[in-house]
């Protein structure tokens, strides 16, 4: 920002980091651009793709769409679960994925969110019997990694002013890469 002579301007965080998830960060240099980008996120006009290391499961297909509702797990204010559509907290959730690489005990999947529900990826993959490595809230084991093995590696959106298509990519973080190389 110093190089662009923006050092005295306020920078606005558009995309916040989720706890225990590595991801691309999105910032706006102006308040107006921030509000436009925030609305784009709310209306699912930002494409987000994630890499996840999940426990290998027979229920995983080479590629698939997961379209089941998610709601609060009964008796919890934190946990979510796949619920019936009639459940009072049910919200439609849509995730698509493709297997990138399968190891003996875990699988690397490339995931696209079509909706943005709380814990959506974690709940959908736990529902398939393939919880994320390190995700002890939803059944993943922490013996190989100390956090949930989830990384937002791709963001795509139209610039809020120029409407130019912006695509951002980030490689796998060191801890996830090491697991793949040492399996």
What do these predicted ranges mean?
Residues 1-183:
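RNA pseudouridine synthases
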